Amino acid sequence: MTDKRAVRRAMRARRMALAECERAQAAQDVAGRILAWPVYRAARTVFAYVAARGEVDLGPVLCDVLASGRTLLLPRCEADGAMTARRVQTLDELAPGTWGLDEPGPDAPVCAPGRIDLALVPGVAFGRDGVRVGQGGGYYDRYLPGLRGVAAGVGYDFQIVDGLQASAHDVPVAFVVTPGGIIRCGQE
């Protein structure tokens, strides 16, 4: 399955077909892996996401970043089509944005990608080589090239797909975190 449209369709359907208890267990397993991961524990500035459309919920991770006094950044889709990483002090600051997704407000401080230690990136599918298939808007592919830290995809075990083809503009991730483990891309 290498056609991105077919991959997106199949993975979205599979995510949405998960029972709530399966989603909750996956979120718990992923959070446990991230919270114990040395890369996460060393990160002072973490760029993450608020789950939507069946994505793995990172709620416990977001709360841990805030509780530990580290910097939590969340994405905001801007009117010009760009994505920015904005600092939040509490999850209560979030409101539905451009695509109906919960995001920081326009007054939340912007952080440059070069200041991020760890980016936890959603995706529709991931390859073991780091290829990431996103929603199709290219937001992360435009944002991640400026990242100096580690980019880690987050998904369910079934979102690891063999044979994904990268396009010229696709930006790979260094790791993929799933309920089943943390994959160092290109190492297996």
Language model segments and positions:
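N-terminal active-site beta-alpha-beta segment that forms phosphate/nucleotide-binding
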Residues: 1-115
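Conserved phosphate- and dinucleotide-binding cores of soluble alpha/beta proteins
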Residues: 81-188
